[in-house]
């Protein structure tokens, strides 16, 4: 506990639980706490009602707040990349942080990780703790090689940055200067709005800012500050010029003026003025235009390239059809801003004038309406696609006033009737180019396990999220600590079931090591203490990849052996707070360990058992050292006997002694010599350990003489009696005598070492040493690939709903874990397939790198359609979004087929290169875009007929008015697949 004393556990639990519910307010400061430390604290205070069995147990005492796991090595302030809220860290408001620090202190040498709450979004306000600050590179105009890096909040202003730069380069306030935003090798943009924030200015991670000082003659080194287009301000992203005039006047755009200085031209006009767009080579192929990375925005670039190469959607925008369908009044839309911004970007990309453009205006508009995308952190490409398709749909929804629709269950009606009804109801509220191109219909069947009630509904979809066959196993690296005190820990790699338990881990380790599974105890060691001691029935999902798992061999059956008890042991180094005070403290070091010892024992025997347990890394003295009063080892010690730790229990094992002055905890204590034990026949010796001063079978001999000080004292905790204090030592050390000591399952020992003795006799390198088993080098064979159709079949497989996601049965009037089955009823002209590579759980995150074999052409989906009237439904691939790397990071690119020349190209941010079909199918494929073959005409796109845009997803034929339905019955074709041409 903190030196000044901590609040009782109930108060701690109540206070922090309340403060965790604090609402975010712009400008407030919150603090990051490593989730591992926080979980340990939750155990200690019994935070969760189901996890109170260790409440107050010093075995789980968290100690000082330790955020080292969040920081890059060697950097006290830089966070590791791709940390995830609640999985890697917990956010606490200032008051909560101050309370925890007052109770537990902060680890020495660490600084608080404080972050501000910023407000994101323009129309949809959203407060968020800015965990990752924006790193900017600062330099002077006259010396751009001297770059200084600083981190700023998105809420910091340009004025704040300028003051910091002036401070760094010793530029006086009275000296006139101006800031420039530097792009690439020789591209500059003035930052002339001091009140604008970093977010408003669109500054991104790693951006280079240059400060320029005015010459003595009143001129500027970089020339006049007025840009070629006086209206091309650099911060605002709201276009003043109409979209049509911009798209029709690319060549004259630099000559335009903006009357209202608060607004400016769209992003690409400013880029052209300042070379943000690379001029295309002569007759650049339309559509072969890269997108600059604004700082971790490759996810957005990949999504845009896939949509840009979706012919029906791009033709719609290039032909300005969107302008007559903009819906400015839709409360679910974005006032047409997303559609307009996207349209201008597409026109620029397909103008044939640029080899790449910078989509900053579009990025800013997206961030205004979807704050989760407003920063410059890596995001999920599919999540952006979902937002963008929905945003474009609502901005272009032809329905101006959505009617209320009462949803109905099938109630035994034919599927065709129910499907028709569902699609008609959908079109009454949702009618847009996005619906025309991307929306399909699937059938959902739920069956109640109690009353057998069957519920059938038909629901529209915009894309298919297909599960990948999951790996049923995972590999874990663990360390096995043998009973033999001379044996080094051995590292193993075990293959265990993903949904298995701790017993499965023990069984797998037993097969490799020969140690019986029932003689193992599995632990998680963190920060020199036991973070967790697992029960055999606990789920393996609670073990994360970064956990240090130690398995201890114990030669007793804990369920049957009533004579022994397993106790945790931790090592602590004592220190004094100052030379003039007697107040002492301690800090943990080394690896803790478990020991099985007799319940009824004497304290001196316990001391000797502990000493022998550490003999591999506790140095022995030579005869010369002995004469000087240094340590020596007792004789006749059984190293590998018949005790629960490989020790003989009847005698007193080795004693160590020094001539150091005794302290008050062990004054005048002397242990009698006990030499009646003989060496065991199966003793294990070391390899030249005696030459290195380490305790071995041969060196561990001798007897105690005189009044000597032991290597360490130890404190004993039996929950409910005296506590073991982490910071401030208790003076009531156990005295080393023969009085009986009764131990139980809640016993805990802390061994306190004097710093001088620890330095002299404790070999930390030997203590940390371990060996590797050959299994560590084993790489599990990976399944070569799965077919896309396997994923579709898995999507349509019947499953049981989870306990956390039950279905409300209208018949039982209760939530039930029903069985659910999805079936495809109809498919759209463009089918978007999302391969679900990322998986999340409470304890772990994972990316599946399974190779999915998908066809480039002739994907026949008819076998998966349950509509009995379904005809052929074949698709060709037109685009792929790729993700390289792991969870929370990596890089996105795209393959796409150009609609004009029919060739494949590879889009990697601003770079565009040719590609071949054999490159497209890879483990990186994440989102697939397929276009139905009947919507193509040659290499181009056969445009959608606006008059037949309402093709029924139920029958695949155009919807008719009531007046015409009877006359046209004979002309209808029984087709599926939402044919719209």
Curated annotation (Swiss-Prot):
Residues 2-223 are annotated as: Mediates interaction with SART3. Pfam families: DUSP (PF06337), Ubiquitin_3 (PF14836), UCH (PF00443), USP7_C2 (PF14533). Residues 289-933 form the USP domain. Residues 7-118 form the DUSP domain. The keyword Protease applies. The modification N-acetylalanine is found at residue 2. Belongs to the peptidase C19 family. This is Ubiquitin carboxyl-terminal hydrolase 15. It comes from Mus musculus.
